[in-house]
Amino acid sequence: MLFPELSLCGYPPEDLLLRLTVINRGPDPSELTVLPTIWFRNTWSWGLDVRRPRMRQGESGPGVSAVEFDHEYYGRRRFLCEGAPDVLFTENETNTRRLYGDSDGAPYVKDGINDYVVHGDKSAINPDRIGSKAAAHYVFSTQPEQPVTIRLR
């Protein structure tokens, strides 16, 4: 079960705090995987806007992972993840290989994070740690009814 809580810091108004609490509701100890994900809406593939914003691994501090990005409209931003999780990067692109058998499809596609986490496909995420979609990869070993909290900014 997931309980999200969003708080506004005040200034600047775009500075958001997010607290996610996940609880193992099963009767047995369990491993929980949580993937807080950020992405840019794909407007470049459809000719609406050819500019493609980029995210990249940012400078991380003790106990924190960072994603940095520049956007023409939103400016320079950072996504901070408490606990220093690995951050997985891919593109917010449709997997045309899987859907249509297109051999020229993008190498890193929107379902790449799923393929990495669920199927262990290391080639599904960008090793250069850049893309238009990123997810913080948290894995917790929990006891029954044990809550785990993640804080993001």
Where in the sequence are the language-model features?
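Coil-to-beta-strand transition motifs
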Residues: 1, 11-17, 27-31, 146-147
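Extended, loop-rich substrate-binding clefts of extracytoplasmic carbohydrate-active enzymes
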Residues: 1-14, 109-136
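Conserved phosphate-binding loops in nucleotide/dinucleotide-binding enzymes
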Residues: 25-26, 137, 141-142
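Short Pro-Gly-centered flexible turn/kink motifs
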Residues: 140-153
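Hydrophobic residues positioned within well-ordered beta-strands of beta-sheet architectures
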Residues: 2-4, 18, 32-36, 136-138, ...
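Polysaccharide-binding surfaces and accessory modules of carbohydrate-active proteins
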Residues: 17, 22-110
